[in-house]
């Protein structure tokens, strides 16, 4: 009988096996091992777990194998009786041999049963030569080969029970009973019988080789062939799930062969190893867990391969290497299509012109960055330099300043990047001279430059210290934006390390701290992108894969259509520049020609050779703003050192370390103030985070604020946010964006517990809609500031104003207010300089806003009596607005006196007449604008009095404010000091007439006052005449005369105020409600109408320079204004305002002289006072 019959008969244990497995499909799906019975006659339980080791099958008990009573349950009823008899005879005669023959192979069967049953038959067929007697006896009982083949496929039927879809395959295989070709593994094993037997039995020590043979023959080759013959789809389902676990089982089973072979007489071997049902259940559960993990891992690998394939398919380089079949040109070492290269260069030049409002003056248009610049722009670095103050607002200084900064960075590199190896070659002559001097003086040679020297002056010692610092920086650089090819380049990483190292050396108080690399990375990318054309396609990809939850179905791998169709070169290509034309030469007029073929000043500012230099100074400018968030102030003031000499240095170092370890109060305070503003717009979210959960704001917002959202949003979205943040103000606009981020995830935070809420805050959901985020941030800012105005709360954040137009004036720093010519006393000035808050107004158009156009107020020494009266009347918001408005006017006029001092200094420096003429034109219109605004305020007072005529307290308060504003207007329009300079007395406005008209107005009844106010003041501007400035002596005389007249006028006003109060009380009692509603649209004051004015006033002959009314003398001797002195008014702490716009950034050149810029004063006052034309 052939050897193959042994393997076939072994598989044909009983047809009862197949019937029982059909009856218990649930158990079959959980099979974990394959175990045959031990062959004893008295052992009625044969534990058999056939096939599918990846399923956790419970043990299937097949009873009474020695009996022939289960014939009705077999699938092949004709052969079942013979099979059972044969097995019984084998079990009686050759019990031990049967066990030995199946000892190792049964274990191997439980591993390989899922891969294909042909492998099992071959393994059992390998062992038939050793136990020849038992095999012959066993095979004699199995003369029916067809039955053996049926039993073989009965085992396959067991696999079919796992999935009912394989019934057809099972039936087809059973029909091929005599076809031994299907059993490829059996044929291979029979042909190589001698080799297998020799390796397996004659050489018992070489069991690892046997394992290799089994693995190669059965696992890799035979399993695939036989299993594919049965069903290909089933191979895909089960093959991948059993690679690791089954192979391990196979190795373990082979290791147990020696024991089974040496103890061939041990009939209880299988009983001890396979009859533990409790352990099988635990093992099956563990196997099921491993299989699920492997399945998920396999799905993930397939998914990643699919993603890579999509990237390759969608890559424009692979799909369309040369889209237009144009001529290829070589730029450096890279070949690119000529037409695409020309288009890129043309776009690069046009981008520079896109950010300016006027190309002749290079006036930048900040509205372009309201919602961020375009993603693919190449002028982002220039915009950032101007917005952060790296470049001034004056374009004529750009070339000179850029050359100076680039030379300065080269000096930093030479001083801080030390290499003793190179220094030895460069300074060889100097060292020889020093050695000669030392030999002449008979002194020993110094070992300062020895590599083992510990001296601070040693170059080697400094070199090793620098290496340690750079190594610390490199750890963070390697983790910066992983996955982006730009930051994985070694040359880019070296540049980032060098920039951060030089900064730490240049600013030892700040040094380098973790997070600075996140701030430098977007800056370096922007500067490099502005000067190079390279493959930055991965920056614009959107990957929303959730690695933690392994949610692949929400994965969105989408490129914008624009970037998908773009062509990208194989390597970086520098844009064409010609910096020789600008190298230290400066530019004429407008700061350089933008129409030159070499790219003009735009090409000079984006020179690829200096992108590292430019990146450093942008980073330095940004760190001057946010550097306070990286420093830690000492918890207590440092006492003076008690030691001197060499130990003093050690004392200073210990104090420095203590300062570094102190709590960073600045950034934490910023987080707390930001969170407190949340209660004005989202009180529910505020109370839930603070009271219900007790989450401290700095736990999550400190990382947002310190590194300016660098780790929250992807790089392409972060660049858009930074455009708007730099345009507005980093320290002022960034908190509003953080509040907006909290509001947008409100639904994900509410009703969450402490840990879940922190999880959402620490891993902020990524959003790609940056315009929506910025638009919401602008709205949040307006709502918060309106709420603070309503509750009369000092606003700590500035509000932007419209951009300047041609009407502008220069702005300077806030200087202490003088006591001689201002209305603020010394105590108020001292308090106002101690701290700063901000007054707020909302601009009508958010897009025309700029961060540096802010109003900063100083905290004063107390509030006025008017605001205190209004608090209990329910009208505090309205009265506070009126009070702040007219007091702001006083402060603006007060500021003129301080700027007059700078005007004198500028006149001494021989200012040109053209510049003075521009200031004259601007300030003439400004004075007209101030007068018109005062008139509108008075009109508002009258209108308010008419509507609240029955409210006596409010009526008196408004009336008092109206009188104060009237007195201010009198001082502006009344000029008694110019009488001596006027030849025509008819062309002046006497002060007495104004006083008389004021008294007559106050003495009339409210009804008469309304009827008299039938027309607004009429101010006629005459044509401009030649202007000559009065000398300083004349000005001093005029100021003295003006002060005397002011003293007289104040005495008269005090006497008349008492009469006014008495008359007002009588008027209010006699006034009827119906009379207060007449003529609502009339002018608010009668004393300035055409009847009371004797002559028309011309404001064309006034000169206003640096916030001061300056007396001038014209040929026609028209009306002129002198130094203004205003009545004392109590100033509230919220009303002192420092005017600052985007053009008022004070920049100091190398000599330390302040460089002031111009701004639109007219639009600024219009926005602040709330009056829009």
Swiss-Prot record:
The protein's name: TBC1 domain family member 5 homolog A
Residue span, Rab-GAP TBC domain: 374-729
One matching Pfam family: RabGAP-TBC
Positions with biased composition (Low complexity): 26-107, 127-203, 217-290, 431-441, 995-1015, 1054-1078
Coiled-coil boundaries: 163-214, 885-930
Cross-referenced InterPro entries: Rab-GAP-TBC_dom, Rab-GAP_TBC_sf
Keyword check for Coiled coil: yes
Polar residues: bias regions: 314-324, 983-994, 1079-1089
SUPFAM superfamilies reported for this sequence: Ypt/Rab-GAP domain of gyp1p
GO-annotated molecular function: GTPase activator activity
Annotated keywords: Coiled coil, GTPase activation
Basic and acidic residues composition bias: residue spans: 299-313
